[in-house]
Amino acid sequence: VKATKITFEEICNVWNVELWPERVSAIEPHSAMTWPFEGSPEQYDMNIFEYNPIFWGVYIDNKLVGVNSGHRTTDTQYRSRGIWVNQQYRKSGISQMLFNMTEHQAILEGCDMIWSIPRKSALPAYIKFGFETVGDYFDEGMEFGPNIYVKKRINVNS
C-alpha cells in the first residue's frame, strides 16, 4: 500500500468516472462552498480559491484505489472533499488513511476544524474517523445527494 500526494489531473480522472459520473457542474480543484454553521458566511466565497488544494491517492499494486482532496475554506477551517475508494477495497482502512493525510495537512496549515458534506452512503467512514453530523440530510444544491454536513475538531498543538 502506497499513500501519496497526486495531481489534480490524476484525481479528476477518478472523480469524473467513479465519484461524479455525468456531473453537470464543472469539476474544479476547489469548491467555493463555505461552512455555514459558524458566523454568517455567504454560501460561496471566491477567496477560497486563494488557498492551495492538495490531492491524495492510495495505490495497491500500482493501481489507484482511493483518493481524497482538501483545502482551507478560511484560515482555520479545512474542507475534506471528493473521497472515493474502489468498491473492491472498501472497509479495509483506505478511507481512514486518506482522512489521516487530510487531517495532517489541515494541522500543518494551522486549522482547528475539518468539515465535509458526505453522501449518506459514505457517512459511516466519516463517523469512524471522528466526524460528527451537523443538521439534517439535504438534496438542495447537491447533484449526488442526499448529503449531510459533518465536522471534526482537531488539536493543532498535538
Predicted regions and their residues:
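A short beta-loop-alpha structural element at the N-terminal edge
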Residues: V1-V14
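A conserved beta-turn-beta hairpin within the catalytic core of GNAT-like acetyltransferases
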Residues: R72-I83, R90, M142-F144
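Conserved GNAT acetyl-CoA-binding A-motif
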Residues: A106-R119
